[in-house]
């Protein structure tokens, strides 16, 4: 056997060092390589086909109804990233959430909500969509799409992997095929449901003192709509005559109903709703900054009377039962009808009562 030269020994030592270094490198990066992220380590200048998605693992936001873990097991398997810009008030953001969920499922994409929407909805509902981190939102190459408020054929074939929706969608045509899933997403937290049911249990019919068996939630939208509807949209809000007719509709069809009135104008309601029959309860607190108490009350009722607005829509949609709504509440030439289709806003089985537009005709006179 030929003795190894000093040069051969040096080369062998260098080879062992190189192999050891490669082995160590592969060991420390084995998890990344196994989950598809090793490509960015080995070839940092090459774009990943599916970039990693960061989320907030916030308390009370499980990834799916069937898991108790708030964090995903494998975010690299996601197909695209869709979100929606949170805008407007409580009912608006419920509509945006439901529409995002439905359109993302329809197009085979993964839906995420932004932190502001989580802050608005998670204290009230057991929502399950994960939350997109701001740093991911800021560096994602979004294509933006503003939605109108009814389902369109083109929304069923959106090929964009990174899509940020916007607008004020709140039409059943987007999500009604997923009604049970939507109702599950908007399940009240236990303490809110129990508090609302406790209020209803304490109610008594004024004349007999009996506990009512049929509760009709009444939502009367006032506030800024008193100016916005006539001045901007050539429209009206529900008046006392409409509410009286709607209540009489329920009195004719249900035995001894009690009407649970909520509003952001409770003083007006007490002055304009006839409570002499003993079946009207002014139960709402009218706090616009914390609407969930009134909303919880409405959803625990059997039926609904709504005026206008997304808050009333969602109360009726989640409560089920019969719903009476204010119909034809704008003039025929209102710009509002360009962004609002009544047939897409109200379920076909709901009952509409025409609004009194005479105050608008008076305003239109020279």
From Swiss-Prot:
The name of this protein is Galactoside alpha-(1,2)-fucosyltransferase 1
- Which taxonomic lineage is given here? Eukaryota, Metazoa, Chordata, Craniata, Vertebrata
- Residue ranges that the UniProt entry lists as topological domain Cytoplasmic: 1-8
What keywords would UniProt list here?
Glycoprotein, Glycosyltransferase, Golgi apparatus, Lipid metabolism, Membrane, Signal-anchor, Transferase, Transmembrane, Transmembrane helix
Please indicate if the UniProt record lists DNA-binding as a keyword.
no
Cite the CDD domains for this sequence: Fut1_Fut2_like
**Any idea of its EC number?**
2.4.1.69, 2.4.1.344
List the Gene Ontology MF annotations in alphabetical order.
alpha-(1,2)-fucosyltransferase activity; galactoside 2-alpha-L-fucosyltransferase activity
Keyword RNA-binding attached: no
Pathway-wise, it operates in:
Protein modification; protein glycosylation
Catalytic activity annotated for this protein? a beta-D-galactosyl-(1->4)-N-acetyl-beta-D-glucosaminyl derivative + GDP-beta-L-fucose = an alpha-L-Fuc-(1->2)-beta-D-Gal-(1->4)-beta-D-GlcNAc derivative + GDP + H(+); a ganglioside GA1 + GDP-beta-L-fucose = a ganglioside Fuc-GA1 + GDP + H(+); a beta-D-Gal-(1->3)-beta-D-GlcNAc-(1->3)-beta-D-Gal-(1->4)-beta-D-Glc-(1<->1')-Cer(d18:1(4E)) + GDP-beta-L-fucose = alpha-L-fucosyl-(1->2)- beta-D-galactosyl-(1->3)-N-acetyl-beta-D-glucosaminyl-(1->3)-beta-D-galactosyl-(1->4)-beta-D-glucosyl-(1<->1')-N-acylsphing-4-enine + GDP + H(+); a neolactoside nLc4Cer(d18:1(4E)) + GDP-beta-L-fucose = a neolactoside IV(2)-alpha-Fuc-nLc4Cer(d18:1(4E)) + GDP + H(+)
Main localization category: Golgi
């Amino acid at each position: 056997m030929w003795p190894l030269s000093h040069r051969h020994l040096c080369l062998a030592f260098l080879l062992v060092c190189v192999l050891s270094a490669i082995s160590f490198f592969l060991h420390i990066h084995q998890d990344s390589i196994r989950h598809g992220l090793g490509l960015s380590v080995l070839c940092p200048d090459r774009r990943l086909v599916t970039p990693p998605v960061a989320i907030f693992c916030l308390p009370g936001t499980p990834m799916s109804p069937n898991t108790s873990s708030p964090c995903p097991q494998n975010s690299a398997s996601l197909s695209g990233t869709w979100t929606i810009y949170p805008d407007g008030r409580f009912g608006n953001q419920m509509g945006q959430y439901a529409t995002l969920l439905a359109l993302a499922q329809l197009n085979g994409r993964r839906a995420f909500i932004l932190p502001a929407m989580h802050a608005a909805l998670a204290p009230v509902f057991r929502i399950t969509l994960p939350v997109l981190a701001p740093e991911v939102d800021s560096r994602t190459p979004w294509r933006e799409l503003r939605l109108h408020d009814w389902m369109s054929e083109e929304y069923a074939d959106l090929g964009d992997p990174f899509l940020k929706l916007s607008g004020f969608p709140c039409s059943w045509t987007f999500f009604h095929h997923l009604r049970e899933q939507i109702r599950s997403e908007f399940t009240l937290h236990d303490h809110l449901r129990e508090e609302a049911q406790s209020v209803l249990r304490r109610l008594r019919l004024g004349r007999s003192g009996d506990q009512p068996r049929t509760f009709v939630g009444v939502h009367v939208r006032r506030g800024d709509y008193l100016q916005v509807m006539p001045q901007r949209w050539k429209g009206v809000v529900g008046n006392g005559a409409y509410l009286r007719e709607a209540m009489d509709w329920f009195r004719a069809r249900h035995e001894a109903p009690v009407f649970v009135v909520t509003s952001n104008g409770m003083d007006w309601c007490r002055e304009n709703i006839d409570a002499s029959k003993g079946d009207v309860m002014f139960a709402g607190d009218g706090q616009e900054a914390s609407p969930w108490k009134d909303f919880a009350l409405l959803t625990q009722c059997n039926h609904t009377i709504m005026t206008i607005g997304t808050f009333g829509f969602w109360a009726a949609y989640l409560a089920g039962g019969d719903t009476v709504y204010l119909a034809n509440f704008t003039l025929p030439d209102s710009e509002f009808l360009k962004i609002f289709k009544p047939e897409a806003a109200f379920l076909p089985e709901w009952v509409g009562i025409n609004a009194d537009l005479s105050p608008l005709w008076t305003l239109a006179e020279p």
